[in-house]
């Protein structure tokens, strides 16, 4: 089960201790209905309107600890382009990914979204 959770959330280890899965373990054990309800709350029903580019940008920004310059460098885009994308997400969701609490909500929502996609592919 630990390896499955690790593969869902792209943890890059061939050996995975269940105790070290952290938030991924909580998301994995979350009932589908609760996950779907959380996504609805976070994205205000506009999840389908967000482009994959926007979601990928948020993911990369979070991976880089909310560092605009480093994220822009890794994505090969101008920092103003990154700021524009983050502001576009903020307008659609009301969440400012540059604020810790909002970033936490978005990170959790993206993990839940990934888990729900995995469950759908597995027929769960």
Where are these regions (language model features)?
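Cytosolic nucleotide-utilizing catalytic cores of signal-transduction proteins
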Residues: 1-124
């Amino acid at each position: 089960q630990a390896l499955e959770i690790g593969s869902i959330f792209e943890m890059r280890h061939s050996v995975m201790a269940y105790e070290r899965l952290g938030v991924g373990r909580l998301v994995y054990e979350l009932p589908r209905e609760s996950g779907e309800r959380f996504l609805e709350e976070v994205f205000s029903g506009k999840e389908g309107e967000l482009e994959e580019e926007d979601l990928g940008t948020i993911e990369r920004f979070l991976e880089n600890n909310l560092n605009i310059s480093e994220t822009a460098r890794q994505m090969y885009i101008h920092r103003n382009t990154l700021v524009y994308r983050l502001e576009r997400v903020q307008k659609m969701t009301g969440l400012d990914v540059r604020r810790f609490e909002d970033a936490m909500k978005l990170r959790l929502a993206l993990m839940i979204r990934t888990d729900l996609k995995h469950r759908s592919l597995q027929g769960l």
